[in-house]
């Protein structure tokens, strides 16, 4: 199932969030936006968290490195990491083509509601156009 960027929520730090309910629990799949991938350009390395790690909103959980810069990745949600996209670090070029499907980074079992600071697509596009 392809993710529609217009249905996702976004952090100011360019992570996207796709929330799904499974068996009464809520899970958030998290990745970085196409805008962030474009700005970083030529990705060379990504550091991912371990499954089982507990994250708080705003906590750094990894980093992505390009030939231009090293950028931390921040958790836009609170919860436990239940899955990590282990194929991603070896296939970073695919992020340029598919930041929203292949480009997912981790899946978190939510321990709290989504923060109100997460933006909808229109607000995120506005932030990107002002930054771009």
Swiss-Prot record:
Residues with N6-lipoyllysine modification: 68
CDD domains on file: GCS_H
One Pfam family recorded for the sequence: GCV_H
Cofactor note: Binds 1 lipoyl cofactor covalently.
PROSITE patterns (alphabetical): BIOTINYL_LIPOYL (PS50968), LIPOYL (PS00189)
Coiled coil: none
Keywords noted in UniProt: Lipoyl
Cofactor: (R)-lipoate
GO CC term (a single one): glycine cleavage complex
GO biological process, one term: glycine decarboxylation via glycine cleavage system
Classification via InterPro entries: 2-oxoA_DH_lipoyl-BS (IPR003016), Biotin_lipoyl (IPR000089), GCV_H (IPR002930), GCV_H/Fam206 (IPR033753), GCV_H_sub (IPR017453), Single_hybrid_motif (IPR011053)
Keyword S-adenosyl-L-methionine: no
Domain Lipoyl-binding: 27-109
Residue stretches spanning the membrane: none
Role: The glycine cleavage system catalyzes the degradation of glycine. The H protein shuttles the methylamine group of glycine from the P protein to the T protein.
PANTHER family the record matches: GLYCINE CLEAVAGE SYSTEM H PROTEIN, GLYCINE CLEAVAGE SYSTEM H PROTEIN-RELATED
Subunit structure: The glycine cleavage system is composed of four proteins: P, T, L and H.
Family recorded in the similarity comment: Belongs to the GcvH family.
Protein name: Glycine cleavage system H protein
The encoding gene: gcvH
